[in-house]
Design a protein with these regions (language model features):
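Extracellular loop and loop/strand-boundary signature of outer-membrane beta-barrel proteins
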Residues: 45-46, 68-72, 109-119, 161-170, ...
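Short sequence motifs at beta-strands and strand-loop junctions characteristic
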Residues: 52, 76-79, 120-124, 170-177, ...
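Gram-negative (and chloroplast) outer-membrane scaffold detector with strong preference
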Residues: 87-165, 173-181, 186-188, 225-231
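C-terminal segment of classical bacterial N-terminal signal peptides
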Residues: 16-24
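Bacterial N-terminal signal peptides that target proteins for export
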Residues: 1-11
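Short glycine/proline- and aromatic-enriched beta-strand/turn motifs that initiate or cap beta-hairpins
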Residues: 24-88, 229-236
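Transmembrane beta-strand segments that form the barrel wall of outer-membrane beta-barrel proteins
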Residues: 58-70, 96-103, 198-202
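Predominantly the C-terminal beta-signal and adjacent terminal strand-loop region
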Residues: 189-236
Length: 236
């Protein structure tokens, strides 16, 4: 009599095991879907469309320039101003760049009997030349340039009619100039760029001494500007 009872118990257990998955599936199907508490996060890359295929760009920065206002002057001048530059790209790597820069400030003066101390001085550059796009990716780039042109030096504004040689200054003049350096660019979007521009600034001024004799002087100084560049949407 024990065998039938055991078989009956075994059959009951098997029936429960078979029915359990079916009940679980039914409960799972009947449960309504739950919506997420927060919306789905979508990442957007602001630099995804940086391709370096623009035709034009324009940059403006706050500028610094070190210079000497005279050939034998011991004290240098630290000038501040603006750097406005633009480029026309002929290909991916080569372009033509033009730059206009204005630097103003004061300078030390040579010993004199006219009580002239710290007079105003200024340099205004207008140069153009070749530009080369070096290593670059969507985050930034390195660009080199070599530009040539002229500079107007304003040295006599505060001399009150005193000859510039009295304070070891150059006279007011337009002189040959060159700017060689480049740009360090950090892309902020497809069109906007944070730009740092360090340069070597070369000038070739003429000075006149008390006897009227003239001589030319070749100077190399450091300049840097920090600002923003805008790349126009027009493509090559």
């Amino acid at each position: 009599m024990r065998l039938p009872v055991s078989l009956s118990a075994l059959a009951a257990v098997a029936a429960l095991v078979l029915c359990a998955p079916a009940r679980s599936q039914a409960q799972a199907k009947s449960a309504p879907p739950q919506s997420p508490v927060n919306g789905q996060y979508v990442a957007i890359d602001p630099l995804a469309n940086v391709h370096y295929d623009n035709r034009y760009d324009l940059s403006l920065g706050l500028a610094y320039d070190h210079m000497k206002a005279g050939p034998t002057l011991l004290q240098g001048s630290n000038l501040g101003g603006l750097d406005l530059s633009g480029s026309y790209w002929l290909s991916r790597h080569w372009g033509i760049e033009g730059s206009g820069r204005a630097y103003v400030g004061t300078s030390g003066a040579g010993p004199n009997t006219e009580s002239i101390n710290g007079p105003f001085v200024a340099q205004y550059f207008f140069v153009g030349g070749a530009e080369w796009l070096g290593p670059h990716n969507k985050h930034g780039d390195l660009t080199a340039h070599a530009m040539f042109g002229g500079v107007y030096g304003d040295f006599q504004k505060d001399l009150r009619g005193t000859p510039p040689y009295v304070v070891d200054f150059y006279k007011n003049q337009v002189a040959p100039a060159a700017i060689i350096g480049g740009h360090f660019d950090l892309n902020r979007s497809e069109q906007w760029v944070f730009r740092v521009t360090p340069d070597a600034v070369m000038t070739h001024y003429t000075s006149t001494n008390a006897s009227g004799m003239s001589s030319t002087h070749y100077d190399v100084n450091f300049a840097i500007s920090v600002g923003a560049e805008y790349r126009f949407k027009k493509k090559r």
